[in-house]
Regions:
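Catalytic cores of the polymerase beta-like nucleotidyltransferase superfamily
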Residues: 1-449
Length: 449
């Protein structure tokens, strides 16, 4: 907690105490404190004073903001603190937002904590005394590394909690209690908005050391199919043992995910990089064949693109992110193929030129190799690719033929102009000098005329 925010929380607590109430730190802050982790999320809950009294207190301490005054949630401008009053929720439908909320300042800590999702998130700490209030055994579950729901009725009303269970399990390397798994199997996730699904997935992909746990736990809860069907379809898809000692495509994907997590901080687009790990072998679902005892997945990187597109468009509207992942997934086999062939500079230049982020393509090919088991990363290939990326960047920094050069030479823009520019760009990738490239391009344009 930032010291400035802590001091303000203490001021609020002191004013509330003067009115006969108590102020508690709640939720993730208390959990992280007991885990020895730093938490930027500061949530306090005010008990024992009426909403109007709390509003007067906040007005006296700063500029009050209302994040949801009708259900007792406030803030103070300039401070990163969420200030809430105890409340109860009643489901009015099947959706994540289908709830009626009732503010009750005198609900008591037990009932207030009962609405939380997991025991490790249901603990409270008195801001002034430091006393920990733990009605549901959160500290013990924290020690054991177990995620356990607090209340089966309220847990089952909110399907997002299934994803949160998998997300927390991945982030903290916790197990999920058997009774929570059983309850989660009965819940319907189809009513969730894709933004909520993506939010939990993003946390698992970017914060977990082993993001594979997210999908493994979703599978254990029988909840992969609604949002992650293509991952279920990877289970049992065979791979040649010579190249994939780790087993089927599901096992490989899980290992690539955890390998990618080791490299994601180096990627220009960490979320896109991790999503690529999820989807990169979807093409094997439709391309894998077995002939004379040999398993093949010819051209799976490109054949999988429709499945990748379908998967991504289900969970996000971010076109730039979708474009990045589709590009990286479709090219992920090329770096090691070209390195193995010791391909010429034009071939590697063309590969990098077709990549949205060339460095991330190399990085992902490394993660893919790591996902095949120990010894699959070949240092000589890595060096080859990095040297060729340097060469590509050098090539692209050289003068090249532009549209203005062609117009100056007498060409007029028309239907074939883009084809002519593409020809000149191909010469640039071949490291042909600008003068020579211009001459060859004009000759090509004459042949097209």
């Amino acid at each position: 907690m930032e010291n400035r925010d802590l001091k303000m929380a203490e001021k609020i607590a002191a004013c509330v105490a003067d009115k006969g109430g108590r102020t508690f730190l709640v939720g993730g802050y208390v959990r992280d404190l007991l885990m020895g982790k730093h938490s930027k999320d500061i949530d306090i809950e005010i008990h024992g004073v009426q909403p109007k009294e709390l509003e007067n207190i906040l007005d006296g301490l700063g500029s009050r903001t209302e994040m949801g005054a009708s259900f007792g949630v406030y803030g103070l401008r300039g401070y990163d603190i969420d200030i809430a009053m105890p409340r109860q929720e009643e489901a009015t439908g099947r959706g994540h937002k289908d709830f009626k909320i009732y503010v009750d300042p005198f609900l008591g800590t037990y009932k207030a904590a009962m609405r939380r999702d997991f025991t490790i998130n249901a603990m409270m700490q008195d801001v002034l005394t430091g006393e920990i209030i733990d009605h549901f055994g959160g500290q013990e579950d924290l020690k054991k590394g177990v995620l356990r729901h607090v209340n089966p009725h309220t847990f089952a009303e909110d399907p997002l909690r299934v994803l949160r269970a998998a997300q927390f399990a991945a982030r903290f390397s916790f197990s999920i209690a058997p009774e929570t798994i059983e309850l989660s199997r009965t819940m319907d996730l189809t009513t969730l908005a894709h933004e909520r699904v993506m939010s939990e997935l993003e946390k698992a992909l970017l914060k977990a050391a082993h993001p594979s746990i997210f999908f493994e736990q979703m599978h254990k809860m029988n909840q992969l199919d609604d949002w992650f069907l293509h991952l279920t379809q990877l289970i049992g898809v065979k791979q040649p043992k010579k190249y994939h000692p780790e087993g089927d495509v599901w096992n490989h994907t899980m290992q690539v995910l955890d390998s990618a997590a080791l490299l994601r901080s180096k990627a220009e687009n960490p979320l896109g990089f991790m999503l690529t790990a999820v989807v990169h072998d979807f093409g094997k679902i439709i391309s894998t064949t077995e002939e004379n005892g040999e398993i093949h997945s010819y051209d799976h990187a490109k054949k999988g693109d429709p499945l990748v597109k379908e998967f991504l468009e289900r969970i996000t509207n971010e076109t730039k992110l979708i474009r990045y992942v589709r590009n990286l997934a479709s090219l992920h086999m090329r770096p090691y193929e070209l390195a193995r062939e010791q391909a010429g500079k034009k071939a590697t230049n063309q590969m990098f030129d077709s990549a949205t982020v060339p460095y991330d393509l190399i990085l992902f090919s490394t993660a893919d190799q790591m996902g095949k088991g120990k010894g699959q990363v070949i240092p000589e290939y890595e060096d080859f690719l990095k040297e060729r990326l340097d060469w590509y960047q050098y090539t692209m920094a050289q003068p090249c033929v532009m549209g203005a050069d062609l117009i100056k030479a007498g060409l007029k823009p028309g239907p074939k102009f883009s084809e002519i520019l593409a020809y000149s760009h191909d010469l640039h990738l071949s490291n042909v000098s600008k003068d020579e490239a211009l001459a060859q391009t004009l000759s090509f344009a004459q042949r097209l005329a």
